[in-house]
Amino acid sequence: MAPGRRFRSGTWPRVKDFRTVMARTAEVRRDTKETQIRVAVDLDGTGVSNVSTGIGFFDHMLESFARHGGFDMTIETRGDLHIDMHHTVEDTGIVIGQAFNKALDGFKGVRRFGHAYIPMDETLTRCALDLSNRAYLIWKVEYKTPKVGDMDTELFKEFHHAFAMNCGACVHLETLYGTNSHHIAESGFKALARALRQAVEIDPKTGGLAPSTKGVL
């Protein structure tokens, strides 16, 4: 049996197998002619990350995502940056989504839903999500500049779409107001992370089953 985690005192009587919960980790690799990517994730970590994509601002966003989600993550991406950043950003989103989906193992035992409001100076962003295995993205985010640093702001939607589609998550992300493109981007990543942190949390009331009347997700 793989290493497990113990529930805090007081929660175990309501869990089908109260003694241990399997470690929720995954590693996914993806190699194409455009990108070579490895992602490892521990959903029950402490927010420690090792990120290298070749895009400084993107690294910063992914580090914030890991920290505020409480996920331990290793993200190694080598992409065709001599062309542009599109393949690197989108494909990284694909593999992170696949890693989360794999670690969630059929979404068994999780709270499933999560939401967060993140203020960042003049900006306020909201994320609500459902780990439904019905992938969808509602994107209501407008940037005031075409770039943040060297990164095209249009690529942030590509990342979030790729993540949602491959994680199996229904994600609604909206910036309610804001003017600084850096703040808009960062509050979006943090909102997604905080909402996911809620949604992936083990819910003892599920008894380790998928949180759905269908019995599966």
Q: PLM ranges: what are they?
A:
Residues 21-217:
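Structural preference for solvent-exposed beta-strand-turn elements
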